[in-house]
């Protein structure tokens, strides 16, 4: 028989920097999960990633106080800002442009995000990324 699920916890944690302080500690502590065990497992799995890159994670908590977690790809907005070399998007995205990315950069981001996107092929994924970039005030050349 499968274990009884008591809840899901969604967090965004910087790669390799999970520690028991908020938001990780309180979120896991409420469900009675072993915080240090999660931190060690998460940091081990994000070892190969760029340090500090926010990684969305979905933790499944079970009734016997055990857990499993699934890591997602970093948010598209973070990858777009990194590619465009800007700190934040525009406050008026359709009038003030803060940067630009090329189609090649958009394709690279789309390849990274492909497991989490609903796009059928790479071209559709690139258009999705281009739309996200435009809504941040970043132009996409060649799309």
Swiss-Prot record:
Keyword Amino-acid biosynthesis assigned: no
Modification after translation, per record: One or more lysine residues are methylated.
PROSITE patterns: RIBOSOMAL_L11
MF (Gene Ontology): large ribosomal subunit rRNA binding; structural constituent of ribosome
Keywords recorded for this protein, A-Z: Methylation, Ribonucleoprotein, Ribosomal protein, RNA-binding, rRNA-binding
Gene Ontology BP annotations: translation
Role: Forms part of the ribosomal stalk which helps the ribosome interact with GTP-bound translation factors.
Assembly and oligomerization: Part of the ribosomal stalk of the 50S ribosomal subunit. Interacts with L10 and the large rRNA to form the base of the stalk. L10 forms an elongated spine to which L12 dimers bind in a sequential fashion forming a multimeric L10(L12)X complex.
Family to which this protein belongs: Belongs to the universal ribosomal protein uL11 family.
Cited PANTHER family: 60S RIBOSOMAL PROTEIN L12, LARGE RIBOSOMAL SUBUNIT PROTEIN UL11M
HAMAP family linked to this entry: Ribosomal_uL11 (MF_00736)
Record protein name field: Large ribosomal subunit protein uL11
